[in-house]
Amino acid sequence: MAVVDDLAPGMDSSPPSEDYGRQPPQDLAAEQSVLGGMLLSKDAIADVLERLRPGDFYRPAHQNVYDAILDLYGRGEPADAVTVAAELDRRGLLRRIGGAPYLHTLISTVPTAANAGYYASIVAEKALLRRLVEAGTRVVQYGYAGAEGADVAEVVDRAQAEIYDVADRRLSEDFVALEDLLQPTMDEIDAIASSGGLARGVATGFTELDEVTNGLHPGQMVIVAARPGVGKSTLGLDFMRSCSIRHRMASVIFSLEMSKSEIVMRLLSAEAKIKLSDMRSGRMSDDDWTRLARRMSEISEAPLFIDDSPNLTMMEIRAKARRLRQKANLKLIVVDYLQLMTSGKKYESRQVEVSEFSRHLKLLAKELEVPVVAISQLNRGPEQRTDKKPMLADLRESGCLTASTRILRADTGAEVAFGELMRSGERPMVWSLDERLRMVARPMINVFPSGRKEVFRLRLASGREVEATGSHPFMKFEGWTPLAQLKVGDRIAAPRRVPEPIDTQRMPESELISLARMIGDGSCLKNQPIRYEPVDEANLAAVTVSAAHSDGAAIRDDYLAARVPSLRPARQRLPRGRCTPIAAWLAGLGLFTKRSHEKCVPEAVFRAPNDQVALFLRHLWSAGGSVRWDPTNGQGRVYYGSTSRRLIDDVAQLLLRVGIFSWITHAPKLGGHDSWRLHIHGAKDQVRFLRHVGVHGAEAVAAQEMLRQLKGPVRNPNLDSAPKKVWAQVRNRLSAKQMMDIQLHEPTMWKHSPSRSRPHRAEARIEDRAIHELARGDAYWDTVVEITSIGDQHVFDGTVSGTHNFVANGISLHNSLEQDADVVILLHRPDAFDRDDPRGGEADFILAKHRNGPTKTVTVAHQLHLSRFANMAR
């Protein structure tokens, strides 16, 4: 193949003549004149400081000089060549700017200090152009990022934000010192006091509501929520009428529900006090027409904007709001309503998508420094109550859990019940699955009651159980799915391993061993000797050594009925009524007086690092577990038994710390306590247990034999498998890459759930993020085997920041979606549910959340026939 030059005659093949390496826009002479004028005249400083910031100067030396001048001027000290040189020297910057002689150079170059303000305008223009160049460079980078797979909508939005920041001259820092914030805050407090308690915000038009909230403040997100037909859109328009018609401040409504004509008709009905039904039907009287014409002329100049574009996305709302902020000094945004918004993206659930809208609206409020009112629809919770009053929990989309549900903490490694979190008010770090299906620590920022609802018990093939309402989402391969939509045979996520807690605390090994022995095979009842029943002499020796930590000794009593050793003080007798050190130690751990079916693992063990967790499990297994090889079936048997379900769950949780997933079986017993067994299945997990945990005492020999047998070919049940639907994704990707080789094209293979090794092999051949996460993530895909209603119970939920999920009872569950709102107003109208209600004509604004003040219920009059709410007579 030949390479030829196909340029036309006369065309030069040299690079373009434009110099792409030229300096950014700047005017050093103007910068020097500005600084020279400021050094000569205090009046010049006053003219310049409102126009320039240190970052507007191109030369870093000029930035330092300008900053020093402003600092001296702010302290009331003179700012001349001598004092500025001293200030720069104190900061260690004098040599960097060229020494004291350079300050005199600045003074000598200024034509006249009287024109310093004009010179500052030149510097500001050049700074604006530089920022435009910088923004353009970043936009180009965003464009290339979009070509390489970044989300296009996000790229466009970031590009718009860059240009908006340039036009708005907002070069904000990521952090601001407290001293720079104190005076503006004092000014705001003074303004509030001088205006009779009303902040410089947007008045809602409702006297009592404004008294509580001090108006709608810049940067706030306000949610107005109600059931359909109660009047939430009307209230949003009332806020806009107060803002734009009464106070002549610009407002905009992005309406996804009503058309422009419907909105204008409602506004005219409210302002002219004409029945909306008469306007719609054309039955207006002459007086109505007169009032309408008069009011139209009065409100026609109101800076009120309406956008009824269908299928509005968050990106479009941001772009339009930014333009209005520049064009009309926008003061209020209303979005009607939240659940009708679309994103154009694929989210794991609608709940997460709505939560993202909420978060972006809050960010928009902060960016534009205006209040954003988001209209939202409540779930059916109010209709199920006798008084029909809405609660904050009705605003959330997720389901609820019972008080006994245990949440896995990331700070201590232990579990804590929802009910306990409600009582204590604690908000701990919890383990959560991120988008890569990896366990990460995230804060649980809220825990709250959700009333009394029907609860279902969901049981998995592994024996794990959780009690939740039908609306609570569980994680399937396809995404988060409410319990009511799950069916037997579905696969949902549970953690296959859990990291060490954030705050690990080592225990003395002697205490750890004694604790494991006492939990596994000990007795510590009140008014009885503390006993331990060893399986063999090696285990008795371990207890004898470890008991010394609490000044105790394992002593075999001589009388026949004793049969087992007692743990008691080794040296002295205690006065009557005093606990032994061993009993006091067990009581401090919450184990003293616990019977076998009440035992559990203390929090101190969960706090221990993983090597100590393995040591604890080794001695616990020696006391109450079994490890053996089954030659008949050609597989290993590893299990632990107890009459305490809580203890079994705790052991299962500890096994996750060493990367082992276990299975729980139930053995009912008539006339006694049921028993439970925890099994470790599969050669891979059994080998891991034997190598990283092991057993102590006589069973150690059996464990070595079992490990030897597991090195050969053994029966291995395919328990650790991925959902069968993953094959569709694998096949599509392999087919697209023409990689359907013999290893992954066996006809029978596609009919069954793949073991984790197969997606792992596929992931090595195809570049698919979902397959990668499935093959390497921390999610175990357990199978639903039973869903049973257990009646109505009081339920609770929580909110986890960022990832929006947590581990409860060993299962990954979605959380409630915390609203990002600063203010939540729940609208309640008694006669909406009962026309004969004695409070007919009244409505309640329930201020359910108020980040900067108290909550309260404000009663107003509803005049929905006039499309408005009104203040009640006081």
From Swiss-Prot:
Please report the stretch or stretches of sequence annotated as the DOD-type homing endonuclease domain: 582-660
Q: What does the record list as GO biological process?
A: DNA replication, synthesis of primer; intein-mediated protein splicing; intron homing
The record's SMART domains line, in alphabetical order, gives: AAA (SM00382), HintC (SM00305), HintN (SM00306)
Transmembrane region(s): none
Q: Does the keyword field hold Transmembrane helix?
A: no
Q: Which SUPFAM superfamilies match?
A: Hedgehog/intein (Hint) domain, Homing endonucleases, N-terminal domain of DnaB helicase, P-loop containing nucleoside triphosphate hydrolases
Molecular function via GO: ATP binding; ATP hydrolysis activity; DNA binding; DNA helicase activity; endonuclease activity
Query: Using the chain's own numbering, where are the disulfide bonds?
Result: none
Q: What is its EC number?
A: 5.6.2.3, 3.1.-.-
- Residues that bind ATP: A226, R227, P228, G229, V230, G231, K232, S233
Under Pfam families, the record lists: DnaB, DnaB_C, Intein_splicing, LAGLIDADG_3
UniProt entry keywords in alphabetical sequence: ATP-binding, Autocatalytic cleavage, DNA replication, DNA-binding, Endonuclease, Helicase, Hydrolase, Intron homing, Isomerase, Nuclease, Nucleotide-binding, Primosome, Protein splicing, Repeat
Give the residue ranges for region: Disordered: 1-25
The UniProt catalytic activity note for this protein reads: Couples ATP hydrolysis with the unwinding of duplex DNA at the replication fork by translocating in the 5'-3' direction. This creates two antiparallel DNA single strands (ssDNA). The leading ssDNA polymer is the template for DNA polymerase III holoenzyme which synthesizes a continuous strand; ATP + H2O = ADP + phosphate + H(+)
Report the PTM annotation. This protein undergoes a protein self splicing that involves a post-translational excision of the intervening region (intein) followed by peptide ligation.
One Gene Ontology term, aspect cellular component: cytosol
Which InterPro entries did the record assign? AAA+_ATPase, DNA_heli_DnaB-like_N_sf, DNA_helicase_DnaB, DNA_helicase_DnaB-like_C, DNA_helicase_DnaB-like_N, DNA_helicase_N/primase_C, Hint_dom_C, Hint_dom_N
- Which protein family is named in the record? Belongs to the helicase family. DnaB subfamily.
Q: What does this protein do?
A: The main replicative DNA helicase, it participates in initiation and elongation during chromosome replication. Travels ahead of the DNA replisome, separating dsDNA into templates for DNA synthesis. A processive ATP-dependent 5'-3' DNA helicase it has DNA-dependent ATPase activity. The intein is an endonuclease.
Subunit structure comment from the entry: Homohexamer.
Name of the protein in question: Replicative DNA helicase DnaB
Query: Which gene carries the instructions for this protein?
Result: dnaB
